[in-house]
């Protein structure tokens, strides 16, 4: 979906997402970890996720497990200051919702106080109690099933899920239990397209796919992946629409070359003294005290 930057954008709401699901309108979601990314993405997307993926995308970690609530608060506040029109969702990081309802509510409520419209948490049946506790406190919850990065050690790596009868049917059961617990949407990650399609058609709430085929109610990719800003292995489900890493390096290389050959800064990038001061500055001589 594309918007005109010249017209005020109507805020995206949770009821609007449900209406779009009912009408077959696809949802566009991406991540933002700072104000710059939020300002770039907001006129274009429907949902901005301040994801715990900030850990491996921006902070140099191998996975999302080291990301703390304090780290998430820092990045959420940066994005929230841009006052996006998009629905702003904050990830509940590892151990922020595993330690009891009271702490879960406190952590999630803190995200809403800092500008989030909703929170996202990973997991199926084991998270039902936490989802209900949050929804009972009027904290909107987006669920996340399939390849859940916080469970990477249990899963034995970043592997496609739902490829056996037991795991596929369990995912469908979990999806419906999360819907019944009050989730307003579900992220489906790293599962076969047919399984995601079955979940989407059987649920009343929207599904947002990432590596889950084309039949979900919407799609999400990491901002840096779409723009080609990440190095190394690229998951099969990622489509980069430009090579941002190379483009940025080329721009920096041109700038560095201009500095080294004396072409930057040019006259247009320099400030000038008023004519009446140039003579005084040019003829200034250090006094004996300043030359010591």
Curated annotation (Swiss-Prot):
UniProt cross-references to InterPro entries, sorted A to Z: Pantoate_hydroxy_MeTrfase, Pyrv/PenolPyrv_kinase-like_dom, Pyrv_kinase-like_dom_sf
CDD domains cross-referenced by the UniProt entry: KPHMT-like
Signal peptide segment: none
Subcellular location: Cytoplasm
Binding site for Mg(2+): 52, 91, 122
Record's catalysed reaction(s): 3-methyl-2-oxobutanoate + (6R)-5,10-methylene-5,6,7,8-tetrahydrofolate + H2O = 2-dehydropantoate + (6S)-5,6,7,8-tetrahydrofolate
Pathway: Cofactor biosynthesis; (R)-pantothenate biosynthesis; (R)-pantoate from 3-methyl-2-oxobutanoate: step 1/2
One Pfam family matching this protein: Pantoate_transf
Cofactor, how bound (note): Binds 1 Mg(2+) ion per subunit.
EC number: 2.1.2.11
Purpose: Catalyzes the reversible reaction in which hydroxymethyl group from 5,10-methylenetetrahydrofolate is transferred onto alpha-ketoisovalerate to form ketopantoate.
Protein name: 3-methyl-2-oxobutanoate hydroxymethyltransferase 2
Gene that produces this protein: panB2
């Amino acid at each position: 979906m594309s918007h005109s930057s010249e017209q005020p954008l109507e805020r995206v709401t949770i009821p609007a997402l449900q209406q779009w699901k009912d009408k077959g309108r696809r949802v566009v979601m991406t991540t933002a970890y700072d104000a710059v990314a939020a300002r770039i993405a907001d006129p274009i997307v429907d949902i901005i996720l301040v994801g715990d993926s900030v850990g491996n995308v921006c902070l140099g970690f191998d996975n999302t497990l080291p990301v703390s609530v304090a780290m998430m608060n820092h990045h959420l506040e940066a994005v929230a200051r841009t006052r996006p029109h998009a629905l702003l969702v904050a990830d509940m990081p590892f151990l922020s919702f595993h330690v009891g309802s009271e702490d879960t509510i406190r952590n999630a409520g803190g995200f809403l106080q800092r500008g989030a419209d909703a929170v996202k948490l990973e997991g199926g049946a084991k998270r039902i109690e936490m989802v209900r506790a949050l929804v009972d406190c009027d904290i909107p919850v987006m669920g996340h099933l399939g390849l859940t990065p916080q469970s990477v050690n249990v899963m034995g790596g970043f592997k496609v899920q739902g490829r056996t009868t037991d795991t596929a049917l369990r995912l469908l059961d979990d999806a419906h239990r999360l819907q019944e617990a009050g989730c307003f949407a579900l992220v489906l990650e790293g599962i076969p397209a047919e399984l995601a399609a079955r979940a989407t058609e059987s649920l009343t709430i929207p599904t947002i796919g990432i590596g889950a085929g084309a039949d979900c109610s919407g799609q999400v990719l990491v901002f840096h992946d779409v723009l080609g800003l990440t190095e190394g292995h690229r998951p099969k489900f990622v489509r980069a629409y430009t090579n941002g890493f190379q483009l940025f390096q080329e721009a920096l290389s041109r700038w560095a070359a201009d500095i080294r050959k004396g072409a930057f800064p040019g006259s247009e990038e320099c400030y000038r003294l008023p004519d009446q001061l140039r003579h005084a500055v040019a003829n200034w001589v250090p006094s004996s005290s300043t030359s010591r």
